[in-house]
């Protein structure tokens, strides 16, 4: 297994974890992303009629806006809360149109560049430098996360084993942490992945937080000790490694993978529409330039194929699949591709109900929960549905904070409360697994 760091550089590989905070991405000349988002706006509107819906879809398509919520024009209907990023050269045209058409809207972000600078600017760099160790309350680059994994693999070998399940389209390792006490050869397991969609940075932040809490509270928390003694956790902090890296270097709001298309100049596939379950049906697009592009065929993306292969081999062992996204404050379970009740609905629904109540107990944050198709929207080819269809009885997708005030730019100040409350939900689901549900 090739580990991160310079080939042959033993000294670099043995740097203590506390020095990794110095190896961080710092804005050049004070501007992130070459100031490309200066003047861009994020607006929210709700179509009030079918006429407004069709008119908005048409103008959105013409102006090439970036939909934040929902993820596709096909999901917009009367009453749908719609958040979108409007480039500065289109914002005046769109706002004038909305005013003339008497369509109500709210400006959530008046200057996106300023919002980005505020979220991940020089304050973050200072925080990273000043912390005595790894700071779990800031966002980290892919290199930092992989180095963090490597260090934990060395310093906590009694609980953690790091390995690669393959390579991404651009050749990056797909690292996974196996977390748990090696008390016996076979134990049931839970799979957790974060960062399927590149721009949803709070996902990877939670995966890191989960590992931190596990290793720090194993001795002091009876529930955590029971979880790690009786289960293994396979944790993939960054699923879409190429896209996540690209969201740090080039486009903060990139969603897809980074694979190339032979017929179009557009890059990437929606890694949550690329699974072999009702592939490229409702809620997915055949067009390579769309954010919900399903790919040329199921598992076309090496990242998806690698995870699917890993889960298939362990389908008898893995009893829960948890995937972390943003944003909406929801806990979703199958089905996503159809309106139907899953066979073990009562057990799954009970686990979801208890999880969202546990989450709310921390800070009063309310999450909606239910089948993805009716709670969020219908989408085909999702990892959650695939996991359930392949014999994993508890399959959930979290949509973490918030509900749109910050959207994908959730401030670093909210990482701790978001992860703290989510931790309660995940522990609740895990403890539910350890009991028999009838």
Task: Name what the model sees in each region.
Residues 2-438:
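M14 metallocarboxypeptidase catalytic domain recognition
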């Amino acid at each position: 297994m090739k580990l991160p760091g310079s080939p042959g550089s033993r000294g670099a590989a043995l740097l203590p974890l506390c020095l990794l905070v110095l190896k961080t991405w710092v804005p050049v000349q004070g501007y992130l992303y070459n100031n490309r988002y200066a003047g861009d706006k994020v607006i929210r509107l709700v179509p009030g009629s079918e006429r407004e819906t069709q008119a908005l879809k048409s103008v959105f398509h013409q102006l090439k806006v970036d939909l934040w919520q929902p993820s596709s024009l096909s999901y917009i209907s009367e009453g749908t809360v719609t958040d979108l990023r409007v480039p500065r050269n289109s914002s005046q045209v769109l706002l004038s149109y909305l005013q003339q058409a008497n369509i109500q809207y709210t400006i959530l972000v008046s200057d996106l560049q300023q919002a980005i600078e505020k979220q991940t600017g020089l304050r973050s760099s200072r925080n990273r430098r000043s912390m005595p160790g790894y700071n779990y309350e800031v966002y980290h680059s892919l290199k930092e996360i992989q180095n963090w994994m490597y260090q934990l693999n060395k310093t906590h070998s009694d609980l953690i084993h790091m390995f690669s399940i393959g390579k991404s389209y651009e050749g990056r390792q797909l690292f996974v942490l196996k977390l748990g006490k090696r008390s016996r050869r076979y134990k049931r397991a839970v799979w957790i992945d974060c960062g399927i969609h590149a721009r949803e940075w709070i996902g990877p932040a939670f995966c890191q937080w989960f590992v931190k809490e596990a290793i720090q509270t194993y001795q002091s928390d009876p529930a955590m000790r029971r979880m790690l003694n009786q289960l293994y956790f396979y944790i993939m902090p960054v699923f879409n490694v190429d896209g996540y890296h690209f969201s740090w270097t080039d486009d903060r709001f990139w969603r897809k993978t980074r694979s190339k298309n032979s017929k179009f100049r557009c890059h990437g596939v929606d890694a949550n529409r690329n699974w072999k379950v009702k592939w490229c049906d409702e809620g997915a697009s055949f067009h390579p330039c769309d954010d919900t592009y399903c790919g040329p065929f199921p598992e076309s993306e090496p990242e998806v194929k690698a995870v699917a292969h890993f889960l298939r081999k362990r389908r008898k062992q893995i009893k829960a699949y948890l995937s972390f996204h943003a944003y909406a404050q929801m806990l979703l379970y199958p089905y996503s591709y159809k309106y139907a009740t899953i066979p073990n609905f009562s057990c799954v629904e009970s686990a979801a109900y208890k999880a969202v109540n546990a989450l709310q107990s921390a800070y009063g944050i309310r999450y909606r929960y239910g089948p993805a198709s009716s709670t969020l929207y219908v989408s085909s080819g999702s990892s959650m549905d695939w996991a359930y269809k392949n014999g994993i009885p508890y399959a959930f997708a979290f949509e973490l904070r918030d509900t749109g005030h910050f959207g994908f730019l959730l401030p670093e100040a909210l990482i701790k409360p978001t992860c703290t409350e989510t931790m309660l939900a995940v522990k609740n689901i895990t403890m539910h697994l350890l009991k028999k549900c009838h």
